[in-house]
């Protein structure tokens, strides 16, 4: 226990020092002054509603080409050609026309009105870096052309006056800002399409693109792009003077019979911000600004979780001390009436449960999830799943889960043999197919809504075949092989013999109800992972990026400890009531954590998702995720209880 505490403390104090989010193993692109920087359009997004940028009436080239790799398809990125042809390094230009003027009909305006109401944001890439709005200390930074310095506002521009607060003569460069305090800098991905003010709708038709480049003394004229942030404006002829109204696109304008369409010209300007560093490796840290700084909240949550685990550990330590101090030195010929409680059921406690085929299958798949998450956690801490490689987390999850099928077959077969099973071949086949097929089927059903709405992250035919191939050609053989090699191993031994005649179980009182224990036992692990769940949902649903490195590792370890210890305490209480049916309870109790997770997912979806057409997909994903959490917790709870039960009954010595 002391070693675990030392490891947790070391991880906690290094949480703010070492973080995989700063690590990117992809080489940056190098540019010289006036070199063209490629720009690729991506999507229009609000929550889980993600569409192709060119689906809507925005400026588009005559020929649209898509530069997609397999990993970018997994991430849902499109990378299509754009009209941003004048984006160059160290070349500041003003008011460049983005294609030809667009004539908007009433239907087009209603489309844009819907996008504004639902808070859709436009996403694209410059030098493979996602663009976004820059926030410093949770305040939006707005470019101010009158004095070449940045001013700050507390929220994105929401009115013609606030969005047009700059002077009429844009400056050609930006003075270097103080980069020393960048801890709370954050780029919020994408930029809004427009805004609503006094019941009128305005379109952001002008974009200031700010390119932050860096170089070292050894680069000899070569630069890398550190980050790119943008500032949208609603203006006419690039005039973003204070007091000039924006471009109104309210449908009410068409009430005038003379107006049949609205003609709008999109424009953009380029600004460059150059810095010089002495450390050549600093250019690799550009991805840190795309992560939300959650260290303060994570640290508070970790401290609270650590206190909870310490309290549970203290309770368990008292129980173990009581057992081993009073029992381990005794030798029994026959138990006396004073030796009741858990000692009196020693001959029944290892009696095999009902439906132990299903029991072993659940254990096997749960262990596979545990192994997958552990390996994925190691990769995350090592920085191998950085957002610098879109789709990296998805491909890593698929590959790791496929190869950890070896733990599935091994654990299921060992449990099945221990419980006295004889249909070993049947167990091997069902273990490797039943739950994985059910999970894949539920995900496939959920994706019907994604495909019908043509969201960009809808799995392609190639992706579907890849997942099926990894399951059938890698996961299934690994599981079957591991089952085959352990099928002849002798079953694990119990410390006591089993009585052939089952013992009578006393009637329990209302507060000794197993369902009450399950509800209470599932709360502690859920409380520990609650903050990380909220980060995960914000990342997945809202498009924010959060770090899943050391903070996730700490939460992962604390959650496992809490599941094991809470389950041991509940089982000890149950055995003290002379109830030896602990097998299924050790499995079902931790599963309640998955139920709490599902309830929280549904609550998050109801309160945070604004767009239509994603409800069924979100529900199915929440269901699948909660099932995986339940299986993860149940396997850990059972393995902990099995060790605990063997340990305490090994203290009973009989002549």
From Swiss-Prot:
Positions of transmembrane segments: 300-320, 359-379, 387-407, 428-448, 461-481, 518-538, 550-570, 587-607, 619-639
Keyword Lipoprotein belongs to the record: no
Membrane topology of this protein: Multi-pass membrane protein
Record keywords: Membrane, Receptor, Signal, Transmembrane, Transmembrane helix
Compartments it resides in: Membrane
Biased composition (Acidic residues): 174-183
Biased composition (Low complexity): 146-173
Gene Ontology terms describing biological process: phagocytosis; protein localization to membrane
Signal sequence residues: 1-20
Region annotation (Disordered) ranges: 146-185
Name of the protein in question: Putative phagocytic receptor 1c
Organism: Dictyostelium discoideum
Organismal lineage: Eukaryota, Amoebozoa, Evosea, Eumycetozoa, Dictyostelia
């Amino acid at each position: 226990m002391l070693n675990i505490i030392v490891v947790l403390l070391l991880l906690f104090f290094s949480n703010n020092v070492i973080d995989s989010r700063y690590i990117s193993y992809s080489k940056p692109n190098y540019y010289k002054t006036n070199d063209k920087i490629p720009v690729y359009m991506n999507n229009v997004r609000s929550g889980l509603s993600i569409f192709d940028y060119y689906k809507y009436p925005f400026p588009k080239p005559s020929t649209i080409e898509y530069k997609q790799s397999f990993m970018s398809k997994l991430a849902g990125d499109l990378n299509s050609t754009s009209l941003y042809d004048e984006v160059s390094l160290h070349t500041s230009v003003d008011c460049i026309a983005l294609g030809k003027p667009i004539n908007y009909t009433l239907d087009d305006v209603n489309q844009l009105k819907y996008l504004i109401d639902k808070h859709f944001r436009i996403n694209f890439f410059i030098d493979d870096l996602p663009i976004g709005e820059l926030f410093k200390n949770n305040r939006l930074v707005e470019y101010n052309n009158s004095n070449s310095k940045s001013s700050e506002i507390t929220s994105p521009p929401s009115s013609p006056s606030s969005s047009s607060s700059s002077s009429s003569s844009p400056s050609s460069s930006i003075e270097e800002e103080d980069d020393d305090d960048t801890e709370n800098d954050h780029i919020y991905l994408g930029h809004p399409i427009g805004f609503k003010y006094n019941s009128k709708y305005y379109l952001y038709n002008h974009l200031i693109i700010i390119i932050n480049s860096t170089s070292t003394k050894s680069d000899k004229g070569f630069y890398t792009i550190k980050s790119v942030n943008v500032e949208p404006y609603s203006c006419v002829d690039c005039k973003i003077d204070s007091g000039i109204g924006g471009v109104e696109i309210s449908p009410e304008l068409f009430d005038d019979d003379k107006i049949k369409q609205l003609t709008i010209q999109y424009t953009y300007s380029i600004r460059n911000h150059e810095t010089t560093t002495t450390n050549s490796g600093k250019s690799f840290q550009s991805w840190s600004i795309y992560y939300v700084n959650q260290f303060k909240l994570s640290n508070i949550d970790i401290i609270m979780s650590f206190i909870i685990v310490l309290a549970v550990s203290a309770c368990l330590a008292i129980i173990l001390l009581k057992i081993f101090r009073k029992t381990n030195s005794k030798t029994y010929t026959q138990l006396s009436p004073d030796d009741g409680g858990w000692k009196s059921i020693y001959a029944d406690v290892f009696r095999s449960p009902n439906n132990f085929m299903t029991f072993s299958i659940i254990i096997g798949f749960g262990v596979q999830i545990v192994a997958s998450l552990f390996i994925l956690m190691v990769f995350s801490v090592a920085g191998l799943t950085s957002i610098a490689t879109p789709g990296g987390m998805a491909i890593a999850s698929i590959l790791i889960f496929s190869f950890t099928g070896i733990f599935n077959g091994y654990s299921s077969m060992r449990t099945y043999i221990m419980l006295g099973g004889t249909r070993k071949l049947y167990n091997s086949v069902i273990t490797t197919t039943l739950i994985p097929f059910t999970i894949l089927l539920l995900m496939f059903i959920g994706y019907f809504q994604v495909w019908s709405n043509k969201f960009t992250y809808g799995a392609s035919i190639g992706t579907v075949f890849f997942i099926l191939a990894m399951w059938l050609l890698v996961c299934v053989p690994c599981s079957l092989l591991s089952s085959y090699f352990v099928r002849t191993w002798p079953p694990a031994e119990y410390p006591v013999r089993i009585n052939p005649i089952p013992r009578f179980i006393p009637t329990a009182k209302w507060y000794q109800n197993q369902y009450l224990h399950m509800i209470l036992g599932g709360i502690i692990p859920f409380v520990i992972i609650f903050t990380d769940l909220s980060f995960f949902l914000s990342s997945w649903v809202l498009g924010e990026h959060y770090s899943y490195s050391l903070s996730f590792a700490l939460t992962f370890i604390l959650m496992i400890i809490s599941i094991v210890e809470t389950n041991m305490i509940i089982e000890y209480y149950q055995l003290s009531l002379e109830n030896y049916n602990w097998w299924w309870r050790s499995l079902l109790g931790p599963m309640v954590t998955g139920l709490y997770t599902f309830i929280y997912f549904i609550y998050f979806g109801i309160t945070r998702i604004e767009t239509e057409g994603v409800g069924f997909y979100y529900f199915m994903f929440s269901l699948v995720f909660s099932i995986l959490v339940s299986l993860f917790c149940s396997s850990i709870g059972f393995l902990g209880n099995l060790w605990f039960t063997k340990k305490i009954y090994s203290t009973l010595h009989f002549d």
